[in-house]
């Protein structure tokens, strides 16, 4: 068994989508090691005992995250009401990295071409665009010139019965796409197709992913939630060839 971490590390001051609140801010909590060590006493095996905690301020759309239907429509379900069963289970990886480029949109034909004949889509579909290669090296370009789906691609995935779509880009819609069609078709219709954005490491996955998880925190009134996305593989599947920096 091999576990593949598909989430970006959350750090104070990290780059973020220009339309979302600033990156995480870590504030001093109510406990600090120096102060608690003065009154917690000692343990015979571990010496001086101390504890620390902190307060973290962050957006529901920080780093690798899942969009709740509320993100795209008034009076829609929030992050606390995301169906966990839709975001956990077997997944299909569609490698569309040959189209990788600034503001490129992936259409239904591209998705169909990435699916071998005779293969059916799993309820969870992961889109490997290779755009995440510049997440750390050129974050401004990563966020402002990202890739996304066309409307017909979103309709194709919904018609196939997909319940969750993940992408290694900051948004399921490219920044120049009017009307945000992928968000609308996925999040404003029932049942919703949950959207996981800012994935990484998809180049390490095979076509058939035995187990994928991206569980949201049950945050009431939030339009999204950071997730610790990961895949569990039965064995080392080998790797896709990593694309050059877009």
Where are each of the predicted segments found?
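Active-/binding-site microenvironments in catalytic and ligand-binding cores
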Residues: 1-246
């Amino acid at each position: 068994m091999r576990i593949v971490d598909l989430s970006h590390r959350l750090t104070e001051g990290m780059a973020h989508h220009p339309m979302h609140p600033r990156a995480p801010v870590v504030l001093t909590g109510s406990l600090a090691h120096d102060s608690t060590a003065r009154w917690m006493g000692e343990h015979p095996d571990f010496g001086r005992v101390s504890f620390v905690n902190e307060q973290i301020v962050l957006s529901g759309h920080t780093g690798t995250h899942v969009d709740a239907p509320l993100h795209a429509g008034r009076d829609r379900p929030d992050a606390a009401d995301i169906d966990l069963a839709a975001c956990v289970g077997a997944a299909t990886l569609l490698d569309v990295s040959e189209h990788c480029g600034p503001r490129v949109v992936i259409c239904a034909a591209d998705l169909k071409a990435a699916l071998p004949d005779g293969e059916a889509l799993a309820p969870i579909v992961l889109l490997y665009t290779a755009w995440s290669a510049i997440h750390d090296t050129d974050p401004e370009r990563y966020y402002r010139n990202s890739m996304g789906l066309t409307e017909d691609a979103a309709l194709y995935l919904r018609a196939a019965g997909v319940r969750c779509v993940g992408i290694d880009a900051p948004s399921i819609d490219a920044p120049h796409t009017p009307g945000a069609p992928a968000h609308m078709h996925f999040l404003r219709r029932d049942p919703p197709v949950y959207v996981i954005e800012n994935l990484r490491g998809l180049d390490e996955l095979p076509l058939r992913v035995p187990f994928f998880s991206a569980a949201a925190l049950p945050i009431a009134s939030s339009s999204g939630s950071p997730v610790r996305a990961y895949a569990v593989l039965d064995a080392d599947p080998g790797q896709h060839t990593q694309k050059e920096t877009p």
